[in-house]
From Swiss-Prot:
One GO cellular component term: ribonucleoprotein complex
Function: One of the primary rRNA binding proteins, it binds directly to 16S rRNA central domain where it helps coordinate assembly of the platform of the 30S subunit.
PROSITE patterns: RIBOSOMAL_S8 (PS00053)
Keywords: Ribonucleoprotein, Ribosomal protein, RNA-binding, rRNA-binding
InterPro entries: Ribosomal_uS8, Ribosomal_uS8_CS, Ribosomal_uS8_sf
Keyword RNA-binding in annotation: yes
Family: Belongs to the universal ribosomal protein uS8 family.
Keyword rRNA-binding assigned: yes
GO molecular function per UniProt: rRNA binding; structural constituent of ribosome
Known partners and oligomeric status: Part of the 30S ribosomal subunit. Contacts proteins S5 and S12.
Organism: Borrelia garinii subsp. bavariensis (strain ATCC BAA-2496 / DSM 23469 / PBi) (Borreliella bavariensis)
One GO-annotated biological process of the protein: translation
Protein name: Small ribosomal subunit protein uS8
Pfam families xrefs: Ribosomal_S8
Length: 132
């Protein structure tokens, strides 16, 4: 049985669904995915998400967000760390995404937070993805 990287799978599904202008996308449930989606919702990159169950398997239904001209709010969403290549950063060396217009999502000892929060709290962590 193949093991999937749920975060990478989620990022790919969000990217593909927003490019073809779908209204929503279903993702496999995981605590990491839920934490990342909470940040994306707080930062205004998605409308909302809710939980559902199909045939005993838990899913997250994500409602994608578009501007007035039906352009996706998520222009680019890229994984930074992968299962085979984890990338860590201290708060001092946290990269800026699109000169401050994008966000960096990291996994730290305080949970999944944005790069801006990590700098304010002076904690580093694993760089999960960048969004702009």
């Amino acid at each position: 049985m193949a093991i999937t990287y749920s975060v990478g799978d989620m990022l790919t599904k969000l990217r593909n669904a927003s490019r073809v202008k779908h209204g929503s996308v279903d993702l496999k449930m995981s605590n990491m995915n839920k934490s990342i989606l909470n940040i994306l919702k707080e930062e205004g990159y998605i409308k909302d998400f809710n939980f559902l169950e199909k045939e005993g398997i838990a899913f997250i239904k994500v409602l994608l967000k578009y501007d007035n001209k039906r352009n996706p709010v998520i222009n680019k969403i890229d994984a930074i760390s992968t299962p085979g290549r984890k990338i860590y950063s201290s708060y001092k060396n946290m990269p800026r995404i699109k000169n401050g217009y994008g966000i960096l999502i990291i996994s730290s000892s305080k949970g999944v937070i944005t790069g801006k929060e990590a700098k304010n709290k002076k904690i580093g962590g694993e760089l999960i993805c960048s969004v702009w």
